[in-house]
Amino acid sequence: MSPHLFLPVVVLVVSPTPGAFQDSAVSPTQGEFEDLDCGRPEPSSRIVGGSDAHPGTWPWQVSLHHGGGHICGGSLIAPSWVLSAAHCFVTNGTLEPADEWSVLLGVHSQDGPLEGAHMRSVATILVPDNYSRVELGADLALLRLASPAKLGPSVKPVCLPRASHLFAHGTACWATGWGDVQESDPLPVPWVLQEVELKLLGETACQCLYSRPGPFNLTLQLLPGMLCAGYPEGRRDTCQGDSGGPLVCEDGGRWFLAGITSFGFGCGRRNRPGVFTAVAHYESWIREHVMGSEPGPAFPSQLQKPPSEPWEPREENCTFAQPECGKATRPGTWPWEAQVMVPGSTPCYGALVSDSWVLAPASCFLDSLHDFETWRVLLPSRPEEKRVVRLVAHENASRNFASDLALLQLRTRVNLTAAPSAVCLPHREHYFLPGSRCRLARWGHGEPAPRSSAQLEAQLLNSWWCHCLYGRQGESVPPPGDPPHLLCPAYQEEEEAGACWVDSGWSLLCREEGTWFLAGYRTLSNGCLRPRAFSPMQTHGLWISHVTQGAYLEDQLTWDWGPEGEETEKQTCPPHTEHGACGLRPQSTPAGVLWPWLTEVHVTGDRVCTGILVAPGWVLAATHCILRLGSSTVPYIDVYLGLAGVSSLPQGHQVSRSVVSIRLPRHSGLRPPLALLELNSRVEPSPSALPICLHPEGVPPGASCWVLGWKDPQNRVPVAAAVSILTPRLCHCLYQGALTPGTFCVFYTEEQEDRCEMTSAPPLLCQTEGGPWVLVGMAVRGSRELFAAIGPEATWISQTVGEAHFLHLGGSSYWSPEGSDPCPQDLAGSASSPKVAALPLLLALLIPR
């Protein structure tokens, strides 16, 4: 368990006006401490999901200051003693000096003093010897004040429970503090003390909730000395800045300190109640360390034991609270879809995110007059229109496409117990799994043309493919748990011919265990193609939550990351060409995910050749395989991508195209070795259909090279055989009299059985360390070792294709395909093809890598 994923340690520093609270220590007379009373605040009417407390309601609540601001809470248990949480004072195993801390007593608002408020220095801080981390228990600390507190109406000690004290499950208790009102959402000025009612949960019920993976994919083993309080549905809880503060329960007219705020997984999250230190468990430790204090803390007897503990469900039979958002009867019928009607504009589509707020693109409204009286919001299954009273645009909405968001507050609340439902929003750490089922939904201006249901369905690409296909060059791929820069869908069906998606914006809804999340959005499409990259919603959850104070931010519901979750750690994306990404292939490739540029070229007569996708509408192949020698007939050709032998790749990426023309370079006399096949329509970039990069010179320096083809010509399962490139000098000598200009030689470093079959004319690929794959050559007819170089045809390819991905990898190639150096004497007169006896000599003469 990673302690940094817990959220107990306060990060908020609220600085009151300097000098607002001065230490006005007055030594009380001994008579004031006779028969110390506890747990009795002055009569009064009566955090996350909390509200302002009335002054004097919780007179034992103290504020612990460090560096001039509030850090943690605490409870006054005796005039000279405060009880708090150990994690407030221990950093990396080291206890912080007591003289750096001060205790503010009798305070209600951190912004200004009340009568009776005063400050005390801390003389000593004590923590249990066995404390190390919050999740391992013993999270409590005793603070001895440098001088006793002055007791009065706003400063009184709380009662401590004895070890035998029993708090019944379901008891309504109260937590107080100045902590965040939501995750990373600080309590606003004037920083008034907050109170929230929480119900005690039995150990079995709490362990049941924490045994199921939830936020951060973590579970928790409750230990003796821990206490849970909250609600399965969440929404009310303590949060950062409340640590060390009290959880008090009333018993027999007195308030007892049942728990000390310790930690939680997030704040107010579903099925994740707060975890407190059970004070009764540590009675003996407290008594031992305050022994001799006069007066010490009070441990009143429990007047009446609660009835026998209520029955708790067995852990395997417990019931979890279900999400209250993201429910749709069928995909495509979205109960949260909202149409914002502004006079003079087309409808703007958004989504209902709470009972009072709609989220929509800010670009719909930035040019409109803010006469909200004329604005209306239409919701499904609602005959009445909702009026708008307020618009809050994201602060970067006009400058940043990724922040094109606005929140519209409705005049009257929507009853969410009936239709419509609000959509769920992801937390910052939400990781939508690769392969997640998603769907496009309307977003922003425009009325999209009718689409078939299948055209809107998609699965998510993994982060590596998404960021490397559509992100910035060289950007690091965020690992799971970090907010992504992009979300990318892979569509289940190819686009209909002639379809154009440019007239409307789209949002991306993704489903987890039957619950729909608003995962991303895109206001404008790129050309006529379906949107390929969406701005993620994870980075905006805190802003939405802060504004709405009620949006449905929901925890991740599926956690089976599998190998995909490990692939993206510490990876960066290779460089792009001016036409985009090319030659991409993950460093660790799952079984079945192969070479996205490799194509099967099916020629009339059941002949199958190897082809390489070099641009969205072009495939490169060997001429001798495509065109029969002496034939003047142009064959009928189909091209297939995304095939792994007889089965398709995951996510259904099967692409087929027909060839409309064959282009050959103009060579004098000889038949050119390379042919370009023009496809009838472009291929959408995807992990199984992506152009390779072309290197216009020789072999890139420091490259590893492979012959890529099929070992079995029937099933055509791709296989890659490692090779070394011979220098032009060695190649010329070994093929004297038989070497065609523009060809080069390779030497296989693997055994014979690992080589590719050659009838389909396999390609030669090279890759520099961490870089993309580049195409260097295509096999020459009838040879395993001879290849026609791509470099000499670079100009022809560029002029013909227009979008070929030429990538200059830098440095000087260690060979050029042309060369006529004289042969060494010991190789002069070699046969026209390499002999086995010559291989050791060849290896010795190879230029080292």
Swiss-Prot record:
PANTHER family: POLYSERASE-2 (PTHR24253:SF100), TRANSMEMBRANE PROTEASE SERINE (PTHR24253). One of its GO terms (cellular component) is cytoplasm. GO terms for molecular function: serine-type endopeptidase activity. The keyword Hydrolase applies. SUPFAM superfamilies: Trypsin-like serine proteases. The 3 protease domains are not proteolytically cleaved. Residues 1-19 form the signal peptide. Residues 20-46 form a propeptide. Its main location: secreted. Its EC number is 3.4.21.-. The keyword DNA-binding does not apply. Glycans are attached at N92, N130, N217, N317, N396, N415. This is Polyserase-2. Disulfide bonds join C72-C88, C173-C249, C206-C228, C239-C267, C348-C364, C438-C510, C466-C488, C500-C528, C609-C625, C705-C766, C733-C745. It is found in: Secreted, Extracellular space, Extracellular matrix. It comes from Mus musculus (Mouse).
